[in-house]
Amino acid sequence: MSPDKTEDEDKDVNVDQDQFNEEEESLGRVILPNKKKGEMFGIVEKMEGASRLSVMCEDGYTRNARIPGRMRKRMWIREKDLVIVKPWEFQPEKADVVYRYTKTQASYLSRNHMLPEVIDIFK
């Protein structure tokens, strides 16, 4: 403890540093699309109902995406959310949603120039 600080002030500084470290760790590792599996970034343009949505993908195409059953109730998706989609091999105009980014994660990806210019709406 430094001589010019009281015990309470010293504890406050430690708490603030711990909160800062927790915020950094909460971003931790941001999941990126696996290009080998054909995954890509996309922005949700329109909710169509029945677990279907219209997604603007990084390759410039708008695809009809579906939310798989394992994600349906756990992860709520809204318009203008950043998602990872995987186009179907036999119908490339359709895709499955693999992951949804939070607003914090999306802005982090945008700030670090990890998003393609086509879908970077978080500038």
From Swiss-Prot:
The protein's name in its UniProt record: Translation initiation factor 1A
**Biological role:** Seems to be required for maximal rate of protein biosynthesis. Enhances ribosome dissociation into subunits and stabilizes the binding of the initiator Met-tRNA(I) to 40 S ribosomal subunits.
Q: What organism does the record attribute this protein to?
A: Thermoplasma volcanium (strain ATCC 51530 / DSM 4299 / JCM 9571 / NBRC 15438 / GSS1)
Q: By its UniProt entry, which NCBIfam families does this protein fall under?
A: eIF-1A, PRK04012.1-3, PRK04012.1-5
Q: Which InterPro entries match?
A: NA-bd_OB-fold, RNA-binding_domain_S1_IF1, TIF_eIF-1A, TIF_eIF-1A_CS
User: What's a Pfam family in this record?
Assistant: eIF-1a
Start-end of Acidic residues biased regions? 1-11
Listed HAMAP family: aIF_1A
Q: Does the keyword Protein biosynthesis apply?
A: yes
* CDD domains linked to this entry: S1_IF1A (cd05793)
